[in-house]
């Protein structure tokens, strides 16, 4: 379809001329890593805390942008027209990796800190399973991009920490002190509850292990992927409501009636990706039935023909359009269409969502990137920063990379 080719071309333009240059500009050459805060008014705080999740995600992003370049998805000529060379993408990934290795990873107790001061010294020494997972995700992709075996060794050290320190017999635990004593999970709890276990952490451990398995085919990692899929299907997925539950007690009883629209559409394609990487027919059959249902349900209840609402908490819909939810919507519906081309409505939804993003979510101001969130009518919400520990190129950059890889441009 010509519309899909146009989508891929526009995603490539957004990646090359906007997202990559913006995040290259956030590089801190004095203290390492990337600056941690840019306000809505585009005021850079060079002394803001540096979130380790943010730096893992930036490293992942540049590693995958380089892999896209290496695979021919973007050309040297296209890079140079945007003001950089293809090898500059690997240089950025190396810069991020060096910061992770030298500052974010705790050399005394192992694992990765939650955040650092601007100068690379520890600030919040919480060890969170979610955070360990994103570092594995970054290190695995960086290993693929750079061939650096030390990065792979670090990824496996974090894998071992998660499996030895951050699990019980039924799932993944969440938050720990620096020396891995359990603590309460405020960091991954929202909506007025305090969760012992979360869908979000399980999903992103799965995502990280998928990438680690992709680059190694390690049998132990593959077995954990299967275990996570069973846990997801048996504990997290709610077949009656055709959605994931989000927050749980220690025994995986749900503690809040919450439908996270963005996580459901993201999970649908990430689970499909994991099934493809694992290449196990039993799990393909088991999980595909669920991911098809998640995609269909989100299309029915959360997509208004143009964009995706945020969530529904105890029957009340939050209609804000959040940057990461919109980005995952494009990939999720494109994935749904690719796996069943009879569902042309998913293709139309991905195209319509991109129109909404480029019209309202992409910030046209010089020196900015994407708005954090906009109202249902597309007007920006003015108090949300452009960069902070959670606001990163992982969702929107990945959307562009996925669109280019899936469609070609």
Regions found by a protein language model. Name each.
Residues 1-409:
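Glycan-recognition and catalytic cores of secretory/periplasmic carbohydrate-active enzymes
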